[in-house]
């Protein structure tokens, strides 16, 4: 978290070349062997609002997840979500030389969805709407909106990263703790 905040602030306020250097550009990812951008772009955010929103979400879900599954598994989950989201983005945008992406949203979506599997009775809120939403319903709405926005929106948000990061989080739990899904089904049934 500290590294992400530090690099992002440095890029936003002091060295904008850092942001340009580590943008994830699917078209150039393989052509120019920009493999480091798959991870580095997830450590840098384009602006203060993007950074604050992602770090706020990270704060509320990452620390409980780390305590629950342990530091090693948490780090694997986080980076698996980051890589999964970038691979999906690469696949969709690999022929688009204009496309670029930045931020940790895919990794954070992976953490969020793993959290929902482990803690399905939790209520979540969407900022700034102060209405508690059951975690499972939140997940359905999140996926539905992200899918719709991926197909219909021009808002400079990588909605595919949200979808693929969420899928990565669900796959991670399925691979490392399949019994979590049995507990989830018992609770929501």
Please describe what each predicted stretch is.
Residues 1-189:
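A detector for small-residue-rich transmembrane helices and their helix-helix packing motifs
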């Amino acid at each position: 978290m500290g590294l992400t905040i530090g690099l992002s602030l440095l890029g936003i306020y002091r060295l904008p070349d850092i942001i340009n250097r580590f943008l994830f550009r699917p078209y150039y990812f393989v052509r120019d062997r920009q493999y480091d951008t798959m991870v580095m772009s997830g450590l840098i955010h384009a602006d203060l609002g993007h950074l604050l929103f992602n770090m706020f979400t990270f704060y509320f879900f990452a620390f409980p997840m780390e305590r629950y599954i342990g530091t090693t598994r948490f780090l694997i989950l986080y980076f698996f979500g980051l890589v999964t989201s970038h691979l999906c983005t690469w696949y969709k945008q690999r022929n688009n030389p204009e496309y670029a992406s930045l931020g940790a949203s895919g990794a954070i979506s992976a953490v969020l969805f793993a959290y929902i599997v482990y803690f399905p009775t939790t209520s979540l809120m969407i900022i700034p709407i102060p209405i508690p939403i059951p975690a499972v319903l939140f997940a359905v709405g999140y996926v539905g909106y992200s899918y719709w926005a991926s197909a219909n929106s021009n808002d400079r948000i990588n909605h595919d990263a949200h979808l693929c990061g969420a899928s990565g989080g669900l796959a991670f739990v399925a691979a490392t703790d399949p019994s979590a899904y049995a507990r989830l089904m018992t609770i929501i049934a």
